[in-house]
Amino acid sequence: MPDRLVSATLALRDDGTLVSPEFGELHRGASGTLARAHRTFVAGNGLPARWQRRRTFTIVTTAFGAGAGFLAAWAAWRDDPARCERLHVVAVEPHPFSRDDLHRAVSHMVADTTISADVDALLDAWPMRVPGLHRLEFDAGRVVLTLAFGDTIDLLKKLVARADAFFLDGAAASSDGIRALAKLAGEHATFATHAKSDDVKHALGETGFTFREVDDRLVGDYAPRWRARRHEPPRALPVTTRRAIVIGAGLAGCAVVERLAARGWDVTLIERHERIASEASGNPAGVFHPLMTRDDNVASRLTRGGFLHALARWRALERAGHAFSRSTHGMLHLAESADDFARMRDAFDAFGAPSDYATLLDADAARAHLNLPVAQGGLLFPHGGAVWPAGLCAAQYAAAGERVRLLASTCVARLERRDDTWHALDDTGATLADAPVVVLANAGDAARLAGLRHVALQPVRGQLTLLPPGTTAPLPCPAIGDGYAVPLDDGTLLIGATFEPDDTDPAMRAAGHAENLDRVRHLLPGLIGALPDPATLRGRVAFRWVVGDRLPLIGPLADETQATANARALGGAQARDLPRMPGLYGAFGFGSRGLVWAALGAELIASQLEGEPWPLERELADAVDPARFLIRALRARRVGSAG
């Protein structure tokens, strides 16, 4: 059973003071809260001097509250002409405010009009109150706030980041919290806190922090006298030039291109077809929604993270003038049986989802929502829906601007690494492009190019069907269940899709159309009137590539040759113990969830390259690590001398 997220609340006293049971009295006025946050946390960590002339600087704040620490750091960063290029703030919060209550709290505490635009931007970007990590970008992506909603200590243990400064407050000012922070601390990381108890001082000293009292606060830095960590926090990949090759111009590849270009990388995008988004990403539409399970398992948490991150990135693209077609009326996931609806209800009740994330509809409510007969109710996702994948790819490509160069109608025969540089070669051995970094986003061909023996990709044929305008009842929003139905802008209804593992036939089949018609008739009995002749229908065939656990493969690729040679020593390896091929990354195996995985996967790879905080908890990043199958083989002693 997942831990339900409990939001903070606000109450107004008779004297006009706002009080939160979670945060206590909220002090009024700019001369109070914001100034105290600056003095305690910003100045207490030696800022702004310590971030000056650096590429990135990362702050971990252990209690976001109403955002005073973040707003103070942002204001100091903006006012500093020698500021770092990119400021990351990772903020843990077990009890997030609603957007309305956050507005009330910040307005009550902070009357400084010089940051009113910052406050408005924070409120506009404030995420849904669901557990996990939420990445928000401000100032054209130069200020990044990663909100971690959930239990403070649990999340601190799961974060992946190299912290330069800690704003230590709340539950983290404890032995367990400080031990978790020590695992995140980079060289010479500093901290500042109001907590000065003997227990806090003991925990700081025990984990390698020095400390001293300055007025009413405790400050210090991370300076361990011994090596106490098995794994160091992540670093940026050492490269002499910020150039990358991305192979594959579908949803995965275009998302990576946009994220790298936004960080100042020059990218060569190689696509074997004449244009981008030519394979599964060329479908007329794709459905987009998270999963919900009673135990909030890895797949549920990953799809939630991907769903919310994609929404944020898409809105940013649209605000930047790179619009694309997507539905805006939500999506209804209908149960396939009474037992299936009971499972949906159990998952919904266990999770405690806010209404802007999901709403449970019984059969009558679902029927009223669709204005069509249905056998069961289901889950309504107000921000789910359908997206035109090719339009999204084009928007991401356009956002990359002059930093991307497309090599279309170009096939990569093999990769070679020479002198710290990867070379993409054609079948004659000629170099198509070279760069210190390569990202394989080419679905079924990725394992071949990387020489991965422990990744078994499987093709799945999917045929979709297009029903002409006027042949179906109106459908107000996409609906899914056993199959899906998506209304397109021109009145066409898209239905599908077949699921045919290991079938690589690209030809359209009347039998596939018949299967899709039969499936949607059971999903929505009143949607289609007289059945058309399947042989007369239009459609499209595309291939999705999956692995056995149906999760994507995202991240640095393992050096399987070196791992095999050291198989015995790696029998109990974690993902962080494996040797990797320097500068070689993957984003493939997305199956039918490319719209959910692509944006988050691209952000993860870009963060790994740059040594930035990851947008996923360690457990979830390990779950999509392309080396996970190698790790399982090593543990089972099925590799090399261990076999």
UniProtKB/Swiss-Prot annotation:
Residues 1-223 are annotated as: tRNA (mnm(5)s(2)U34)-methyltransferase. Gene3D superfamilies: D-Amino Acid Oxidase, subunit A, domain 2, FAD/NAD(P)-binding domain, Vaccinia Virus protein VP39. Its EC number is 2.1.1.61, 1.5.-.-. InterPro entries: FAD-dep_OxRdtase, FAD/NAD-bd_sf, MnmC-like_methylTransf, SAM-dependent_MTases_sf, tRNA_MAMT_biosynth_bifunc_MnmC, tRNA_S-uridine_synth_MnmC_C. GO terms for cellular component: cytoplasm. The keyword tRNA processing applies. Keywords: Cytoplasm, FAD, Flavoprotein, Methyltransferase, Multifunctional enzyme, Oxidoreductase, S-adenosyl-L-methionine, Transferase, tRNA processing. Its cofactor is FAD. Pfam families: DAO, Methyltransf_30. In the N-terminal section; belongs to the methyltransferase superfamily. tRNA (mnm(5)s(2)U34)-methyltransferase family. This is tRNA 5-methylaminomethyl-2-thiouridine biosynthesis bifunctional protein MnmC. It comes from Burkholderia orbicola (strain MC0-3).
